A protein has these predicted regions:
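Generic short beta-strand
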Residues: 28-29, 96
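Short, small/polar residue-rich loop motifs at catalytic or cofactor-binding pockets
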Residues: 23-27
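C-terminal binding/interaction regions
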Residues: 1-22, 64-106
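Short, acidic, Ser/Thr-enriched surface-loop or helix-capping motifs
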Residues: 33
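A short, polar/charged loop-to-alpha-helix boundary motif
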Residues: 46-60
């Protein structure tokens, strides 16, 4: 049986899946900062810049002045996503949830 996510974490899944759909990407992520603001992103793949969705979401939060994160959701990503290190650098105790494409926690 799949564990039910808290409402605020489920919202992050919805935001990440929406970013994934908009970008027609294979994965995406969303984070919530300590003020409750959310940031969602899909991977960026330019010749001059490569970011995973989680790296892009953390970068958006940090560039918006976030001083910490409460949670991060990675949809259809891998457990070795380099964005996990970015989450831990900004917020060592933040909850990190990895899900499949449908948003079911792994």
């Amino acid at each position: 049986m799949t564990e039910r996510l808290a409402d605020e974490d489920a919202k992050l899944v919805v935001l990440a899946r929406a970013a994934m759909a908009r970008a027609e990407a294979a994965s995406a992520a969303a984070v919530r900062d300590v003020d409750g603001r959310t940031y969602a992103a899909a991977p960026v793949s330019l010749s001059a810049l490569e970011l995973t969705g989680l790296q892009a979401a953390v970068a958006a939060a940090a560039s918006s002045g976030a001083t910490g994160l409460e949670a991060a959701v990675l949809v259809a990503g891998s457990q070795d996503d380099p964005g996990l290190a970015a989450v831990r650098e900004l917020a060592p105790l933040a909850a990190i949830i990895v899900t499949d494409r449908a948003g079911n926690p792994l």
